[in-house]
């Protein structure tokens, strides 16, 4: 049996694919595996922010096509990069255990303390709006490119600091670059941040992923995505969600930024099995409160 694994060609994407490949080999060492890497539109168009050029789907478009063309059997993505609408013929078939979902501040290699004379580089409005509450006197500007490209821009002196996902730096073995870890109470992570997701063609036998799939990460991710979807959150939308499970209860925190850039945050707790419904209801509550306040 041979499995062809499709991946973006960035170092982090390949590392995440290798995590999936390792799980498949652990399940059955006799399975032959081929890693097929490719550039996506999102990797090529780096001169504009994602919301200006089509959103998160730009990171999966070419990989989806490779699945349709039978050039690969499964594809691997960061779940936070997945659009809300998933092709019914290319379903999500497994998710990884969640890596640390927090965001971090990274300084240039030779710098110990930030001076903020230059902007903080930031890839999303979600991070930007929360960073501005922590560093109100600092400028926050967009930065694009994969993790290593962003670090190069930082070390060249284009920014005083940049924000990244801790999970990516950890998977790349670059934890020493971290200057500050933001708690989820300071910067609420993107929905599904830290989770690796696998897609396949509908009906394709993915029993080799049975040990890889993490049910807790799945339940949390479904609740977080339900919240974002209900608020029509795209790649750079000022929307975030973070869930935790304890004793079969899910605690879900949502963040929503209204049209006047006011930040709304709310937390609810409910039964784990009702996660998607919780995400939907939390979004409606926050949207309703915003509309009520807007009429005052």
From Swiss-Prot:
Q: Which GO terms describe its biological process?
A: protoporphyrinogen IX biosynthetic process
**CDD domains, per database record:** PBP2_PBGD_2
Q: Does the keyword Magnesium apply?
A: no
Q: Which reaction does it catalyse?
A: 4 porphobilinogen + H2O = hydroxymethylbilane + 4 NH4(+)
What does the miscellaneous comment read?
Answer: The porphobilinogen subunits are added to the dipyrromethane group.
Q: Which NCBIfam families match?
A: hemC
Question: Can you name this protein?
Answer: Porphobilinogen deaminase
Organism, per UniProt?
Answer: Alkaliphilus oremlandii (strain OhILAs)
Taxonomic lineage of the native organism: Bacteria, Bacillati, Bacillota, Clostridia, Peptostreptococcales
């Amino acid at each position: 049996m041979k499995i062809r694994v499709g991946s973006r060609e960035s170092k982090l994407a390949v590392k995440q694919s290798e995590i999936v490949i390792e799980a498949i080999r652990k399940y059955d060492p006799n399975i032959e595996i081929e890693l097929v890497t490719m550039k996506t539109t999102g990797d090529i168009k780096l001169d504009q922010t994602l919301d200006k050029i089509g959103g998160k789907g730009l990171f999966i478009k070419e990989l989806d096509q490779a699945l349709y063309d039978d050039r690969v059997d499964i594809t691997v993505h960061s779940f936070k990069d997945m659009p809300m609408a998933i092709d019914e013929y290319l379903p999500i078939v497994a998710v990884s255990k969640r890596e640390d979902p927090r965001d971090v501040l990274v300084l240039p290699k030779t710098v110990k303390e930030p001076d903020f004379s230059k902007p903080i580089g930031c890839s999303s409005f979600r991070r930007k709006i929360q960073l501005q509450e922590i560093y109100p006197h600092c400028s926050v500007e967009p930065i694009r490119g994969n993790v290593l490209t962003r670090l190069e821009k930082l070390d060249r002196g284009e920014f005083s600091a940049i924000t990244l996902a801790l999970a990516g730096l950890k998977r790349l073995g670059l934890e020493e670059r971290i200057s500050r870890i933001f708690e989820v109470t300071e910067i609420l992570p993107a929905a599904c941040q830290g989770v690796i997701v696998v897609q396949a063609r509908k009906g394709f036998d993915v029993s080799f992923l049975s040990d890889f799939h993490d049910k807790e990460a799945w339940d949390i991710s479904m609740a977080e995505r339900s919240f974002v979807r209900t608020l029509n959150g795209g790649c750079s939308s000022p929307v975030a969600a973070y869930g935790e499970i304890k004793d079969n209860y899910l605690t879900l925190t949502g963040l929503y930024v209204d049209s006047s850039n006011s930040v709304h945050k709310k937390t609810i707790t409910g039964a784990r099995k009702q996660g998607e419904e919780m995400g939907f209801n939390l979004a409606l509550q926050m949207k309703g409160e915003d509309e009520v306040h807007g009429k005052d």
